[in-house]
Amino acid sequence: MWSWDISYCPSEVRGQHWYLYLIMDIYSRKIVAWEIHEAESGELAKKLIDRALLRERCWQNPLVLHSDNGAPMTSYTLKARLAELGMLMSHSRPRVSNDNPYSESLFKTLKYCPKWPAKGFASLTAVRKWMLLFEQAYNEEHLHSGINFVTPAQWHQGVDAKLLAKREAVYERAKSLNPRRWSGDTRNWEVAGAVSLNPGKLQEIEFNKQAA
């Protein structure tokens, strides 16, 4: 399942901003595609979805795409394209603020990054350059607490189990050498299982059908 959303990227000029379109994989937390635009539209969202599918090579594997109920997310243009692709569409429930938690959490991580410019960006090009660096650092270097401190890229590539097994072996050896330093079990380095948007809460998923 992918989650996507749009967030503001402020300019140095008061009242001006750009829109960050961002798609992530909720299982691995990996950023799979993003773009910066001067407007919100279903057409721009459609193009980003196409690019994400091409980049991840999953044209033949229909996904579920989750979002809130913003205008670009519910536009006919996007719905029609998802119908062509055979993708399912999931939306946040009306008046429920935490139904898109993964995208919201990622935007918080992004905007609380120490290198986020407090006074805004100088230009559209500057925003894009910043996002390129952030994507690289987040996907390839950031040890994500939600996936047991491996990087999103490692989780996405399926190498997390081997890494976590090595960590567990290191901890067990340390415990055997110095048992007095350990009052209980070592840290749990098991691979995390399935994830969900909001455990225990029904989520509406619809299959998009093109209008005749």
Question: Which functions belong to the PLM regions below?
Answer:
Residues 1-212:
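Charged DNA-binding/catalytic regions of mobile-element recombinases
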